[in-house]
């Protein structure tokens, strides 16, 4: 029996169960945090995504929503560089510790958790919190960047380019103990993460991907294979042998900058709208999505109000597609169609209306 055949049957079973279930329980957490990098404005990402109509869109899909609001992270008054390079380590560590607690609580209460960033260093907290209740989770990381530098390989010092290194078990002897990071326990293995959309990878990151057998699909791979084949292979790798919760960590800069201009590290040659929506739709169709991060929307970097709105609207589309919106139209599932009333009944109703 082929793996492809088994996976096809698994997905058909999951899709059937999804169609039978019209309501997702979704917790929405705003994480207005920017200290994993140096550019201001990404802390306004959650507000921009909300203003673009996220809650209304999820409601229209039949989701049962719990809004945790926007978190207020504890400020760290004196946060010196680590090793004369790493920026805001104590702030990043503490914010992620606080975020992990909220994500953990939401997942334990039975919600699929949506975290609105904020910069991508927040994935340390979201994945750590998720893993407390779903230790066998797998990660689909959609991004222009691998975000797998260690504090010893980074050239920028920005922790939003390093979150995966703190989470990966295989890298722990390569990662120094940063102030504020003592609470973090590595919770994923190299076989439990797949990257999609890479096109700006630092040399040390490329070394890590190759030498630690981490699977990735660059934009060149997407051009060569097509997004359908990329998703088939992603699911073969992550859920082909067993069903397990999926954590989707989606950086808006995975898209081409013509679609998502309001972000801090845009890279030309990114995902098209159709490719991005296909990724989200296919993850929804597995029925295994358990948590989602949507990060790096920075309205302050837009050159116009239109650019800010376009980027936030795109973020809403990704999230909605992950919870059942389709390009044929997102609809609440009907058990049956209404039938016409009998002629007598219709006549009586007509008289009443008159």
UniProtKB/Swiss-Prot annotation:
Region annotation Disordered: where it falls in the sequence: 334-354
Oxidoreductase in keyword set: no
Catalyzed reactions per annotation: L-arginine + H2O = urea + L-ornithine
Family annotation (Gene3D superfamilies): Ureohydrolase domain
GO molecular function, one term: arginase activity
Pathway in which the depicted protein is active: Nitrogen metabolism; urea cycle; L-ornithine and urea from L-arginine: step 1/1
InterPro entries per record: Arginase, Ureohydrolase, Ureohydrolase_dom_sf, Ureohydrolase_Mn_BS
Keyword annotations: Adaptive immunity, Arginine metabolism, Hydrolase, Immunity, Innate immunity, Manganese, Metal-binding, Mitochondrion, Transit peptide, Urea cycle
Listed cofactors: Mn(2+)
Transit peptide (residue range): 1-22
SS bond partners: none
Tissue: Expressed most strongly in kidney and prostate, much less strongly in the brain, skeletal muscle, placenta, lung, mammary gland, macrophage, uterus, testis and gut, but apparently not in the liver, heart and pancreas. Expressed in activated T cells.
Entry's Gene Ontology BP terms: adaptive immune response; arginine catabolic process to ornithine; innate immune response; negative regulation of activated CD8-positive, alpha-beta T cell apoptotic process; negative regulation of CD4-positive, alpha-beta T cell proliferation; negative regulation of chemokine (C-C motif) ligand 4 production; negative regulation of chemokine (C-C motif) ligand 5 production; negative regulation of defense response to bacterium
Subcellular location field: Mitochondrion
EC numbers, comma separated: 3.5.3.1
Residues binding substrate: 145-149, 156-158, 202, 265, 296
EC class name: hydrolase
Cofactor binding note: Binds 2 manganese ions per subunit.
Gene Ontology cellular component list: cytoplasm; mitochondrial matrix; mitochondrion
Sequence positions that bind Mn(2+) 1: 120, 143, 147, 251
Residues given in the record as Mn(2+) 2 binding sites: 143, 145, 251, 253
Subunit structure: Homotrimer.
Main function: May play a role in the regulation of extra-urea cycle arginine metabolism and also in down-regulation of nitric oxide synthesis. Extrahepatic arginase functions to regulate L-arginine bioavailability to nitric oxid synthase (NOS). Arginine metabolism is a critical regulator of innate and adaptive immune responses. Seems to be involved in negative regulation of the survival capacity of activated CD4(+) and CD8(+) T cells. May suppress inflammation-related signaling in asthmatic airway epithelium.
Sequence similarity: Belongs to the arginase family.
Protein name, per record: Arginase-2, mitochondrial
Source organism of this protein record: Homo sapiens
């Amino acid at each position: 029996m082929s793996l492809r055949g088994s996976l096809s049957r698994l997905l058909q079973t999951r899709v059937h169960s999804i169609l039978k279930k019209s309501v997702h329980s979704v917790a929405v957490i705003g994480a207005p945090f920017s200290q994993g990098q140096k550019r201001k404005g990404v802390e306004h990402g959650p507000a921009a995504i909300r203003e673009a109509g996220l809650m209304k869109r999820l409601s229209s899909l039949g989701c049962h929503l719990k809004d945790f609001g926007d978190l207020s992270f504890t400020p760290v008054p004196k946060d010196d560089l680590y090793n004369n390079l790493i920026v805001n380590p104590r702030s990043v560590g503490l914010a992620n510790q606080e975020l992990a607690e909220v994500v953990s609580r939401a997942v334990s209460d039975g919600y699929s958790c949506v975290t609105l960033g904020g910069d991508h260093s927040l994935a340390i907290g979201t994945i750590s919190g998720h893993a407390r209740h779903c230790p066998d989770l797998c990660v689909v990381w959609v991004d222009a960047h691998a975000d797998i530098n260690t504090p010893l390989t980074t050239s920028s010092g920005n922790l939003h380019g390093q979150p995966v290194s703190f989470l990966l078990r295989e890298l722990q002897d390569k990662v120094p103990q940063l102030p504020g990071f003592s609470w973090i326990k590595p919770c994923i293995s190299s076989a439990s993460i797949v990257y999609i959309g890479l096109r700006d990878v630092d040399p040390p990151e490329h070394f890590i991907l190759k030498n630690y057998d981490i699977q990735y699909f660059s934009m060149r791979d997407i051009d060569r294979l097509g997004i359908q084949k990329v998703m088939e292979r992603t699911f073969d790798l992550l859920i082909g042998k067993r069903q397990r919760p999926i954590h989707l960590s989606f950086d808006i800069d995975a898209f081409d900058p013509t679609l998502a201009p309001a972000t801090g590290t845009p890279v030309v040659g990114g995902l098209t709208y159709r490719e991005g929506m296909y990724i989200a739709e296919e993850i929804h169709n597995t029925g295994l999505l358990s948590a989602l991060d949507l990060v790096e929307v920075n309205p302050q970097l837009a050159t116009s109000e239109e650019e800010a709105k376009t980027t936030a609207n795109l973020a809403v589309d990704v999230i909605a597609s992950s919870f059942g919106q389709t390009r044929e139209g997102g609809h609440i599932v009907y058990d049956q169609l209404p039938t016409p009333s009998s002629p007598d009944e219709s006549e009586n109703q007509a008289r009443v209306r008159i």
